[in-house]
């Protein structure tokens, strides 16, 4: 995230993530979040088909709960694939600053999965290179530049950054 090549807004944050170390920059990305699709029947479609509104609401509630259960199950697999926990202290579309008890080296390639929201769960996966060491309050920290990000994951990160900025502006407006 060098100053001269920064084209994304960087914000302070407190997100959790998981990483795995890569042997080279040629490794394929392991994390893949399913795209948001509209394969399920929408509430509006059920209502227009004449389904009772109480039943429509019950079915929508079940759908949300199933999504949550699937997310919890996916988290278990994530812990196996990405064994190292990290805290994300800053994020942008170009990289992150993270802290971890796992020692990293400058030049080390990592794959990182960032939990952007918890309910509903929204994650983004990136591959990046550790570019510098930056300890935070005595905890080892590193700046990581993204080297490969899928468009969908980049869009999720950028949306998170903008939503966070909007939320902060609204809070300041009421102070």
Name what the model sees in each region.
Residues 1-175:
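Structured alpha-helical
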């Amino acid at each position: 995230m060098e100053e001269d090549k920064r084209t994304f807004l960087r914000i302070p944050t407190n997100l959790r993530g998981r990483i795995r170390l890569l042997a080279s920059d040629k490794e394929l990305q392991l994390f893949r979040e399913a795209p948001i699709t509209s394969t399920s029947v929408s509430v509006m479609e059920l209502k227009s088909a004449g389904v009772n509104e109480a039943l429509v609401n019950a079915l929508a509630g079940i759908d949300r709960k199933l999504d949550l259960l699937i997310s919890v199950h996916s988290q278990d697999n994530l812990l196996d694939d990405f064994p190292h926990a990290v805290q994300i202290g800053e994020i942008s579309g170009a990289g992150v600053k993270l802290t971890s008890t796992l020692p990293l080296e400058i030049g080390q390639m990592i794959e990182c999965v960032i939990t952007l929201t918890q309910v509903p769960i929204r994650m983004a996966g990136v591959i990046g290179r550790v570019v510098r060491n930056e300890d935070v309050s005595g905890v080892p920290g590193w700046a990581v530049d993204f080297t490969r990000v899928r468009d969908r994951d980049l869009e999720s990160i950028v949306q998170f950054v903008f939503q966070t900025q909007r939320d902060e502006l609204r809070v300041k407006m009421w102070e």
